[in-house]
Swiss-Prot record:
InterPro entries: F-box-like_dom_sf, F-box_dom, SNE/GID2. This is F-box protein GID2. Residues 35-59 have a biased composition (Low complexity). Residues 1-74 are annotated as: Disordered. It comes from the Eukaryota.
């Protein structure tokens, strides 16, 4: 018997080998299927590494954070403050000295206290230059007002000492001013220290009498 040749068209076609070039057509399709998943995973990783825009806005400091602060008092300058305090009374000068260290140094100026004292005095009959020289040599106008003038104003107003701040300052007459100046000078000389004595005798170096 004769067998038919294998070249007949009835046989089934063989499957291409794995290493043949025919299988290369499926690889791009597989890559296209896998590329979207890999790109989506990369996008998720990049999106997770970057903070959302809302968190960035919250982390930034607000621009209007300083609106809640109290407005600062503008610096008027020492010259302008001095001219204002020069027209103030003694009570205002004492209150201004409690504002700050700079105002305290400014309020302790003897020219301000001189203006406050002379404004409340009557005409004494002698120049302000002579008065200034005497008072400054005895301790200053601020001490003169605190120790002698203010008690006279309280007594002249006829009110107790605790309520003296509620009353306006009383203008002193000529006799009261002279009395306060006399007491001021007496108090100054009473508080002067005794002169040093020699070791050999009890008399002082200038040949004066004994002290105490």
């Amino acid at each position: 018997m004769k067998f038919r040749s294998d070249s007949s068209g009835g046989d089934e076609p063989r499957a291409p080998a794995a290493g043949d070039g025919g299988g290369g057509g499926d690889e791009p399709a597989k890559r296209q299927r896998t590329d979207p998943s890999s790109s989506s995973s990369q996008g998720e990783a990049s999106s997770s590494s970057q903070p959302p825009p809302q968190q960035q806005q919250e982390e930034q400091p607000p621009e209007d954070a300083g609106e809640g602060e109290q407005p600062r008092v503008p610096d008027l300058g020492e010259d302008l403050v001095f001219e204002v305090l020069r027209r103030a009374e003694a009570r205002t000068l004492a209150a201004a000295a409690c504002v700050s260290r700079g105002w305290r140094q400014l309020a302790e100026d003897e020219r301000l206290w001189e203006a406050a004292c002379v404004r409340e005095w009557a005409n004494l009959g002698f120049s302000e230059r002579q008065l200034r020289a005497v008072v400054l040599s005895l301790g200053g106008f601020r001490r003169l007002h605190a120790v002698y003038i203010r008690p006279l104003q309280w007594r002249g107003a006829g009110v107790p000492r605790q309520q003296g701040r509620r009353q306006p300052p009383v203008r002193l007459g000529r006799d009261q001013v002279q009395l306060s100046l006399s007491l001021f000078s007496i108090g100054f000389f009473q508080n002067m220290p005794c002169p040093k004595k020699d070791k050999g005798n009890d008399s002082d170096k200038n040949g004066g009498g004994q002290c105490g």
